[in-house]
């Protein structure tokens, strides 16, 4: 089974994909994770992507499609795939068709996580992680039990992603509406699109996605 999770950055795509990996043995192909790995390794692609990502822009179709193609080639044909954060444009949607067709795969479901923009801004700008172990926290929803001390490892240093700010979030929302939303008619014409309330409790979102995949 091959599925796409759609929604603006911060809608919870990564969380839901991780649960599908754990519960269904699928493989998550997250362009965000793959690009951040390239940025950390300071590869030529990573350096180019870094400036674009931190300004809230979207990296080129050529870069992203190349990363996805290589990832698919590394998997067995029977392995189910979750596309997290891809495709983001009509051009990428058509590229994905070509990538799947060339490997004998078909796209089974497209699930959109719908969100409220103001609530999403609060969700994203408030998040931070332990610098030592990576445990995630939030200013409003999940603060450390002891202020300034990580619950998991006891670390006292925390960090926020450079692009977790309101201006960048709203820029990405505008780009999502302008560039990503228009790809939905492509998949709606195939009858494979479902929508889930991305602002609901994570467990409720997971249950809704499971119901879609099992029907």
Where are each of the predicted segments found?
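Glycine-rich phosphate-binding loop of ATP-dependent small-molecule kinases
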Residues: 1-215
């Amino acid at each position: 089974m091959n599925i796409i999770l759609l929604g603006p950055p911060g809608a919870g795509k990564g969380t839901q994909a991780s649960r599908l990996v754990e519960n269904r043995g699928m493989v998550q192909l997250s362009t965000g994770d793959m690009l951040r790995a390239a940025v950390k390794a300071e590869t030529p692609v990573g350096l180019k992507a870094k400036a674009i990502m931190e300004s809230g822009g979207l990296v080129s179709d050529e870069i992203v499609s190349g990363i996805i193609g290589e990832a698919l080639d590394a998997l067995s044909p029977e392995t189910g795939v979750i596309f997290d954060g891809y495709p983001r444009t009509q051009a990428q949607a058509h590229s994905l068709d070509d990538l799947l067709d060339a490997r004998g795969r078909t796209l089974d479901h497209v699930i959109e996580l719908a969100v409220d923009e103001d609530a999403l801004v609060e969700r994203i700008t408030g998040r931070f992680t332990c610098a030592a172990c990576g445990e995630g926290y939030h200013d409003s929803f999940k603060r450390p039990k002891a202020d300034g001390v990580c619950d998991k490892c006891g670390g006292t240093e925390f960090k926020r992603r450079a692009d977790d700010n309101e201006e960048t979030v709203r820029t990405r929302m505008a780009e999502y509406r302008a560039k990503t939303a228009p790809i939905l008619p492509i998949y709606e014409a195939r009858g494979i699109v479902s929508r889930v309330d991305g602002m609901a409790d994570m467990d409720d979102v997971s249950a809704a996605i499971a119901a879609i995949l099992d029907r």
